[in-house]
UniProtKB/Swiss-Prot annotation:
Compositional bias of kind Basic residues: 1-15
Family: Belongs to the bacterial ribosomal protein bL35 family.
Keywords (A to Z) from UniProt: Ribonucleoprotein, Ribosomal protein
Region (Disordered): 1-28
Protein name: Large ribosomal subunit protein bL35
Short name of any one Pfam family annotated for the protein: Ribosomal_L35p
Cited InterPro entries: Ribosomal_bL35, Ribosomal_bL35-like, Ribosomal_bL35_CS, Ribosomal_bL35_sf
Source organism of the structure: Cyanothece sp. (strain PCC 7425 / ATCC 29141)
GO MF terms, alphabetically ordered: structural constituent of ribosome
GO biological process, one term: translation
Gene Ontology CC terms, in alphabetical order: cytosolic large ribosomal subunit
Superkingdom of the organism of origin: Bacteria
Length: 65
């Protein structure tokens, strides 16, 4: 059976934790940051866990993680 290809766009966006879950960045922290509060920007800077309903799709895009 041939090797499976990794989706490079997904490989740049997701990381796998030690327990096998996937982490992702939160949206809304790239530009237009002047009017957003410091607390809001700080909360957006932390990594989020990918929802369990999306985990299967992410794992199919990243077969070797």
């Amino acid at each position: 059976m041939p090797k499976l290809k990794t989706r490079k766009a997904a490989a740049k966006r997701f990381r796998q934790t030690g327990t096998g879950k996937f982490t992702r960045r939160k949206a809304n922290r790239n530009h237009l940051l002047e009017h957003k509060s410091t607390a809001r920007k700080n909360k957006l800077s932390h990594m989020a866990i990918v929802d369990e309903r999306d985990e299967e799709r992410v794992s199919l895009m990243l077969p070797y993680l």
